Amino acid sequence: MQFTSVYGLKNIVRFGSVVTLSWLLPLSAHAIDVHPTAEQIQAALDQGKEAAQKRNPPDTFYVRFGATDELHPSGFLITKLGGLSVMATHMALRGLQPSEAEVTQVLDGQTMLVSTVIFGNAPNFAVDSYMVFEQGGKAIKPVTVRFDGFAHRSAAWPESPKFKAKVIASFNYADFDPKSHTTITVFPATGGESSFNVDFSRIH
């Protein structure tokens, strides 16, 4: 996966048609709390441990959006509390528990990760892709963007869409409203766009 710093990138040009997908966020997801309380932190760690006891995968705590099939764009984001639950699940499955330093490292994170899967018909279609948030008419740029330099065959191969690729971005918490309705849009350099309507206030 290739990596790109996006400081200094200029205005984005929109190409082609828009694919807009909405998905109700799961009730098990964690709110986007930038400064969670001690009670919230402990609850997130306990939920991760409980998930491991039930043999549930760590990605249970991802906040998913977009399509649920294998041929349309989708994605997920990881909140701070969700990240704690993911870590606690991973470690509990190995008979361990997170240290204070590991918990602090997650809580001190300045950015939120957003991962998407998009589709195209060329193996390099995702190269130089870009992602933005839009909140109340304001475009919010990510700190970094990564993308698959070579896409994988989709479930439709050899029919269209032939390929799927990941585009992953990190957004600074200080740059966006964690309680606002948000449109997440991915722009492949080859044209087109995939948009996801996500109401951050509904993440609980």
Model region roles, listed by residue range:
Residues 16-26:
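Bacterial N-terminal signal peptides
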